Amino acid sequence: NRYNLIYRNYDPELINFCKINQISFLGYSPLAFGMLTEKYFSNIKANSRLELYPDYFNRYSGKASKNAVIKYLNLSRSNKLELAQMSLSYCVNKSFLTSSIIGSTNLKQLSEIIESVNIELNQKIIEKINFIHSENINPTLEREFKLYNYFKRAAKLIFDGRFFDFYKKSVKFFKKLLRLNQ
């Protein structure tokens, strides 16, 4: 299950279910496809995952996600932590996570990942993380909600026998969505 600072859809229902039923909860994407690092803030490198897989990255690149990441970045800097280390430490120290799937492309990243296991976030930092989350609850869903509402309206048009209205609205919607992704 995807689990990171900007995608915590599983708090608390699924987590409680897993605890009660002694089911492991394996988290992946603790750095939100690199969004919870500083590498996608400027000077994006050629052949980076952002360039290679832009459609996948879209779930993390909405305005709400970016705003939340900036707040987490400011928090990490004010506590003399790398954003990646704070993000990883947050996930690693969650008692319900059995493990978290990580990845690195160089030794510096691997070193930061290993070091994050030894970083214990104090209660003040945890409270600030939770406060940021309360202001930006699951910002990655911004686009998913738009798609859900689109398909809900589309189904109604189709069932009402208004297929051509559906087609015209679809073209408008996807053009707008493409503009949002640029």
Residue ranges and their predicted role:
Residues 121, 133-137, 178:
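C-terminal alpha-helix/helix-terminus motif
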Residues 1-131, 156, 165, 172-174:
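Beta/alpha (TIM)-barrel catalytic core signal, keyed to glycine-rich beta->alpha loops juxtaposed to Asp/Glu
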